[in-house]
Amino acid sequence: MLRVCAASEEEPYSVKDGSGFENKIAEALAAAMDRKAVFKWYNKPAIYLVRDQLSLKLCDVIVGLDSGDQRVLTSMPYYRAPYVFVQRKDSKLSIKDWNSPDLVKANKIGFVPGTPAQTMMEKTGLFNVHFNYMHSLTDFQDRRNKYTRISPRRVMGEVANGTADLAVMFAPEVARYVKANGELTMTVIPDDNVGVDGARIPHHFDQSFGVRADDRDLRDAIDAAIPKARADIEAILAAEAIPQLSLPKQPVRGPRS
């Protein structure tokens, strides 16, 4: 048995009916370990899984953490994914990177606060311009002392219907909706960005499984199983239309936000 920590309403990552792509990845991993995936569902956002579930030993592994996440012990990375620009296919704006002149022409830009997107929006002087629109994506809910998730489905819907000209999102979070819509396109953002202080702002991130910091035996067993599960994992990601980047020899460490 492999006890998997899982959020019950974190589409497209994890859904209680098992349709989340990370639910499928967990099952592929468990099969490669000759175990059965048993999901321990949690009705709060996934950002609380480490604190409220894994650390309390209510489950044993989390799918889809940034490699090197210091709250846990992470496995070898099993894929690498980018932040992307999402536009309508018929958009007249040509936006390929953060230096694209057409960025300033975008009517509304959707993004998630606390991510590389916000850092670069601040650098380019666009954060305040699109601040109110960002908060409209949660219907202006008060974010003080609580976490309010911006729905990736909603963000993609607003780009598709023309409310927004552009979204800057983590590809795994939106690829499903881009694929399903047919009128949207993703552009991988290059991983060569720096902030106002010259510090590097990563836009491509290795993804790993996470276990408790003292659970080295399980981490090692997962590492041994990843090569066996790799073909199945890559097929799941391909079906989701998530861009799969080459894993570097020295994986990038550190969280997205």
Q: Residues of each region from the PLM?
A:
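Solvent-exposed coil/turn segments that connect beta secondary-structure elements
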Residues: 7-10, 66-69, 80-81, 88-91, ...
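Short loop->beta-strand "edge-of-pocket" segments that line small-molecule binding or catalytic clefts
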Residues: 2-8, 12, 98-128
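Extended ligand-binding regions for polar small-molecule ligands
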Residues: 20-33, 89-93, 98-117, 196-244
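Sec-exported extracytoplasmic/periplasmic mature domains
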Residues: 30-38, 55, 59, 90, ...
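Ligand-binding cleft/hinge of the Venus flytrap
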Residues: 26-36, 40, 80, 117-149, ...
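Extracytoplasmic small-molecule ligand-binding "clamshell" domains
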Residues: 1-71, 146-149, 239-240
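A ligand-binding cleft/hinge motif common to bilobed small-molecule-binding domains
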Residues: 48-49, 55, 63-73, 123, ...
